[in-house]
Regions:
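Nucleotide/pyrophosphate-binding catalytic subdomain
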Residues: 1-184
Length: 184
């Protein structure tokens, strides 16, 4: 898979950056990553992990729910931590849209858990990182768009369907051609 992606990247002149959770653990790290990407001459693609220990917190939330424990307090704690990350990273006017999305995702957690949609819960971390980094880049003067990989990645028999995924990605980014950076 990585060889195929590398070959496609080299052929098309794509530049892909990957930032893990520790690179996005706090507001200063988000701003540093945005500053680094802003300096890139090519149109970069960025793949991000959940910020800091967010995935661990979401996994603990899932485990607590599965043990029939009350999740209201750990969910409130996680919500506060993530909201603080957003407000520390962005000015108020830019943070508002990210907070709206974050609060929507967090409010859906109990329903997702009740219907055993744990992947939806776990996706929150990456969605937040992509949304927050794109907003941070835009705030620093680099047009960026956050993309949800679930909107274009297609799997067949637990393997990526590259043809369908490429078609869906092409359609998805057609409306975002002016963006300098795509964050997934």
């Amino acid at each position: 898979m990585s060889q195929q992606l590398t070959a496609v990247s080299a052929r098309r002149g794509l530049e892909v950056h990957k930032f893990g959770g520790s690179s996005l653990a706090n507001a200063s790290r988000f701003q540093a990553v945005a500053a680094l990407l802003k300096q890139q001459p090519a149109v970069p693609w960025v793949v991000v992990s959940a910020p800091g220990d967010t995935t661990d917190a979401l996994l603990l939330l899932i485990a607590s729910y599965q043990r029939a424990e009350d999740i209201s307090q750990p969910l409130a704690t996680l919500s506060t931590q993530l909201q603080q990350l957003v407000t520390a990273t962005l000015p108020d006017f830019a943070a508002a849209a990210v907070l709206t999305a974050l609060n929507s995702w967090l409010q859906q957690i109990p329903g997702w858990l009740a219907s055993e949609q744990t992947n939806e819960v776990l996706a929150i971390g990456e969605l937040l990182s992509a949304t927050l980094l794109a907003a941070s880049l835009t705030e620093q003067g680099t047009s960026a768009v956050a993309l949800d990989a679930r909107d274009f990645l297609v799997f067949a028999n637990k393997e990526p369907d590259w043809q369908q995924s490429t078609t869906k990605l092409g359609a998805l980014i057609a409306g975002h051609r002016s963006e300098k950076c795509h964050v997934v």
